[in-house]
């Protein structure tokens, strides 16, 4: 089944609001807890995000089996019930990414977030070929995630965009201002631009000036109303509100996040536990916050619920 949106319609819809990247729930035995995941999606989708990205980085894609990815995507499509577009992941090598994109289309997802190739070195031309092959394997709109080894420059990205009408967006997880400026200067409104650095609220205001109108909010998982309010302040360029919340909440939160590799996901599940919506442990190779560390996000969240 094809998406309810054309790629250009999808880009317009996603770029107009905040993006939800839900965690994936696991039980004490580390099995995918689909009932808890579905219940949480019901709660999240009651808040007006512009789109939901199932089984993404915050959702521990790297720790899921392909069957679990399919189940997570189908659950997201069912539970959101058309209230917002659902974007499914594709990743690993090109053949697997193509299969994942085609599975997402069968599972009625509305678009694809294409993650970097797995465990290999590659240049911009190789990444461009990878993206093009995935785009041509599906009718769904595709957002390419620039991160790790997936480093497309403006020339390579423009070439793929010309060849693939369904390449609808670029998510930046690199943080190279020169690269992002050149990409937006060359491609302009041809693509949707998504902020994808960890704790994207930190960079939301400067990225807005580079054409990045939305971002993936992990904090939305446990403070959706706060996250929507902060996003509104960013779009309004309300510097006073933005820097107050950065100083009082976001930047102290990132200090704990940076304490250990992988805590960018672990701290989100800690935040969910702190607000009474536990999602279970993270899967290895990630590690959960210690009990002593858990007190810190609880204190930071405070009255922001």
From Swiss-Prot:
Protein name: Probable 5-dehydro-4-deoxyglucarate dehydratase
GO molecular function, one term: 4-hydroxy-tetrahydrodipicolinate synthase activity
Domain of life from the UniProt record: Bacteria
Species per Swiss-Prot/TrEMBL record: Xanthomonas campestris pv. campestris (strain 8004)
EC supergroup of this enzyme: lyase
Annotated disulfide bonds: none
Pathway: Carbohydrate acid metabolism; D-glucarate degradation; 2,5-dioxopentanoate from D-glucarate: step 2/2
Homology family: Belongs to the DapA family.
Reactions this protein catalyses: 5-dehydro-4-deoxy-D-glucarate + H(+) = 2,5-dioxopentanoate + CO2 + H2O
EC number of the protein: 4.2.1.41
Cleavable signal peptide: none
InterPro entries attached to this UniProt entry: Aldolase_TIM, DapA-like, Dehydro-deoxyglucarate_dehyd
Keyword Ribonucleoprotein: no
